[in-house]
Each structure stands twice: as structure tokens, then as C-alpha cells.
Amino acid sequence: MRFFFIFLFLSSVSTFQSQVLFVSFKDSKTNEPIPNVQCKIGFSSNALGASKDSLSGFSLQNGEIYFALTTAQTGLTTAKGTIEFQLHYSHPIYQSASKFYAFELKEDTTKLNLYLKAERIQEVRDIIIKSNKPDTVYASKTYSVADFELGANGALFLLTYEKNLMKDAQLQCIYKDTTLFLQQIPERAEALRRDFRGNVHVQTETSMYGLQSTDATLQLRSIPKDYFYKYIAPIVDTSLTRQFYSSYIDIYPAFEYGALDQLDSTYKAILHIQDDLMMELYRSEYKWVDIRTKLWAKNLENQTGIDAEIYVGANVFTKSLYYEPVYAPLFLSNDTLYIFDYPKDMLRVYTTDGRLLKSIPIFHHYHAKQSGFQKNLQQDRKTGKIYTIYEQEGHVYVGLLDLKTGLVVQKVKLAFRYVEKVRIYDNQVYFVYRPFESTQKKFLYKQKLPVRDN
């Protein structure tokens, strides 16, 4: 809960007075809003409580909690005409307190800014690996590595270029130091994308190119880009009998995870993800656009039934500096689903049939400006371990997550600064690197991680 509003409507025998109390919680050092603070306001004769995840008789709307009181109970106001109340607030990693406040019913709005001090910050000791340089996986005097992916059988897929990625990109497939495939991409290449089956595709402006095995030879085939993102990309992972879907699109701050049973074709929703603050800003953009844009959005609403605020948010607010796509990745490990619900500060653990096992509070993403936390969780597909990436002053740190506690149990600092395209496979970190101010092509390196049971 970044902000909450308390509307107090007090009535007396002869007059009716209203008062708005605006309370915000911020970090005392960074001045950033603190999400998911649990609050309770108490009067002498009644008490109101609310938290972001558990509400009792109160409405949670767009990241704000509204209390509505209409009461003539005695004890709410003093003889001086002031209202007195006790405010209790708590947070797992910030100081908790219970304070007494009193204010007069003269102004329409009273602002109360509370600055909390972090009391429980997770400290992880960096693990310094041997000073030897990482091993070189791919080096060429002709080609630079723009992107790469690792296949399940150990095959290495490289998107390389000689001078310009947009003009002379090639897809290479290397297995056990042998180049199995090398072919020019006929369109402007953008990046490599892996699908739920582990197949690697080259993303271009209009198509997705992938390798197809025909008569023991590899051939480059293409499918329409819109087909890939409509029917293939939504499948996040699969178990023996289920496919796990995501309705995520980067221009909407909410989506849903669900599972499709391949035996009886039944679909079950697993978890709805939403960034409440971003959703409120997203929808409120409609209030500030010009009349022409509002009419355009209303016409679309009449045609499709989709709210006009969503059309404006998707086409206007997502292009602003304030919009951040919601981040809440799902991973399948040992027949268990792990959903990192960052908007709610929770790690949700599910069975593959969609039954919630537990919710674990997580805070390793807090103070991102100081810690360098990147929205880039990765799973080692060989070991099943999940890692989070941090970046500070050009140095990249790889943090191992404990799936039982949600804590980062170790951090490993990579040997080089300003590395690109970090991937983790078989307990090793792969990355693209070129020395600063060097004429060397971009090479692919790997650095071994310390072995630790998770």
C-alpha cells in the first residue's frame, strides 16, 4: 500500500462536518513510497483495520484504501471539537509503531507524512571466486556475438554479426566445438527468443526464424511474428499433463497465470497479478487527455466493450516515463510452481494443479537504486535453481535465491565490468563481453558458480 485515504464523516445534532486524512509512508533515506504497509486506526469506541492483502469490510481500489465512516458514536470527538485516534502501522522490514494523533475539523484535508526507518535489511556476503579470468566459449576475429541461447542438449545458438546486426546477422548452432549450422538472416534481426519447448527463434521486425531438422540437416524456417506471440509465447512452461499460460502484455499493468489440463482440456486460473499503483496511474490518464482522444477511446469502447480508460492508458500512458511494466515471473521446479509476485512482496508456491501451498514474504527487490536489483530472474534449466541479477557501478552480481525462505543466500560478482546478455546454465554464468575501448569483437564467456545446495 503506497498511499491510503481515510474519509471520516462525522455528524452531530446540528451540523455535519467532513474531514479527509491523507497518510503516506516513505523510506526515511530514499524518500521512496513503501508498499504493503499494514495499518489500523483506532478510536475510543471503535477500530478500523486494513491491509493490502486482507481486507475486512473495506474496499481496495487502484492501490488506495478508502475508509468511510458515518457515525454519531460518542467518544470520536473531544469537547474541543477535535478528533483523536491511535494509528498502528507495521511492515516486515520497517519499524512498526503505534502513535496517538489529534486534529481539528477545520480544514478539508489533513496530510500526514510518515518516514519509516528500515530495521531488517538482508545483508548477503559477496562470494569472491578465484581471480582467474572466465573461460572463453566463443571468440572470432570476424564476428561479434549479439545474443545467445543454450539448448537442453548443450548446443549453443549464437546470433552474430560482422559489422551491423541489422544488415548482416547470422544464426549459428555450435555443438561440442563443431559448427552445425550457419546461415544469414534475411531480415533485420533483433534478438533470440526461446519458447516453452526450448526451441530457439530469431526475432525480426515481422517474423520469427527457427531451426527445423529435416533428413538429418538443419534448415531455417519462419513463422509470422504475430502468430508466435499469440499462440506460442503465452505458454510459460509445461509439466507432464499441463501447460501453464500467461496473459501478460507489456502495455497493461495486470495479467493472469493459468493452467490447461491436456487430458480433459479444462482451464484453471492460478493467480491474478496487478500493480495497483501503476493501474491507478494507467486509468487516470484518461482524465488528462484532450477531447479528441477521449472521443476516440469512447468510440472504441462502444465497439468492443473495453473500457475507454484502458485504450487511453495503453496508447498514451505506456509511452510516458512513469510507466513500468508489471514484473512477476513464474518458474517450474521439481513439480512445483514458484510465482514471484513482486507487486505484493510475495513468493507464491503452488502445486502443478493450481493449489496454493504457501506464500512467502520477499524483500530482496527493495531499495533497488542502492542494491542494483534488476527485474531479471533466471532459472538454471539444468539444476532448477533460480537466480536474481544485481548491477552496481558496472559490476554484475548473481544472487542465488532460497526457494524456502525467499532470501538471497549468496551473491557472486562477475569478473568483468559492463557485461551483457547474462544467462545461467549448469551452474555456470554465460555472458557477452568486450573490453572497454577495445577493437576486439564481442566474445562469449562463462564463469563457474560455487556449488551450493538449495
Regions found by a protein language model. Give the residues of each.
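A short, amphipathic beta-strand motif
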Residues: L21-D27, L114, I127-I129
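A short, solvent-exposed loop/turn motif at the edges and junctions
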Residues: A79-Y101
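Structural motif
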Residues: N164-Q172, S207-S213, D250-D261, D290-K294, ...
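Short, ordered, surface-exposed loop/turn motifs in non-cytosolic proteins
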Residues: K29-N46
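Short, acidic, small-residue-rich periplasmic hinge/interaction motif at the N-terminus
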Residues: P92, Y115-V137, Y143
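Beta-strand-rich domains and repeat architectures in extracellular enzymes and scaffolds
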Residues: P134-Q170, Q184-A191, Y322-L337
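Conserved blade-ending motifs and adjacent loop-strand segments that build the rim/top face
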Residues: Q183-E190, D226-K230, P361-Q374, T405-Y425
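Short, acidic Ser/Thr/Gly-rich low-complexity loop/linker segments typical of extracellular
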Residues: A47-T71
